[in-house]
Amino acid sequence: DGCEGWKTGCQKCPTLNNYPPVKIDRAHQLVAGKRQLFREMLALGCQFISPSQHVADAFNSLYGPGRCRIINNGIDMATEAILADLPPVRETQGKPKIAVVAHDLRYDGKTNQQLVREMMALGDKIELHTFGKFSPFTAGNVVNHGFETDKRKLMSALNQMDALVFSSRVDNYPLILCE
């Protein structure tokens, strides 16, 4: 919204009517305490994450370069509509179903091969489901679904999972589809 009041302690908020509207402006009373908490958390080694560049830039201007990193996020409305139409999932009976999703499952940058092999080694304690092209994973507890282009089918299958393992080291954006 272009407000720069945070730089000087949020004296008088010019955007109280922005959504959601605020009736009472207490930001100026709280900002010093919040900044102290941030400093204490940074001293403990906490890493701050922002979904947007401008928020990370503002944070880093106060607390130093690299103290806040960006993980972009978003909502895929088409996917949300599909999920809203799916029937409720019953609690898994028996072994947990774990999903691993990547465009190309062979690529270690997107899929931590060692981690997946360690999960496979759990044998009948889990059911491992892979979604993507070129799965190198085969075992009695692995179900390879392949690369699914039909979003409704993919979301229906993922909706049955108990957990998603996202082990990518090279993505700038999380798998919005699977969040």
Enumerate the predicted regions with their spans.
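Short glycine/acidic-rich beta->alpha loop that forms part of the nucleotide-sugar donor binding site
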Residues: 172-174
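Short alpha-helical donor nucleotide-sugar binding micro-motif in glycosyltransferases
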Residues: 156-161
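Conserved catalytic-core segment of nucleotide-activated headgroup transferases in glycan assembly
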Residues: 90-137
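Aromatic "clamp/platform" in nucleotide-sugar-dependent glycosyltransferases that forms part
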Residues: 169
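Carbohydrate-associated surface elements
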Residues: 54, 74
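A short hydrophobic beta-strand element within the catalytic core of glycosyltransferases
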Residues: 164-165
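Short alpha-helical segment that forms part of, or immediately flanks, the ligand-binding pocket
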Residues: 155, 178-179
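Membrane-proximal helix-turn-helix segments that form the acceptor-binding/catalytic region
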Residues: 3-48
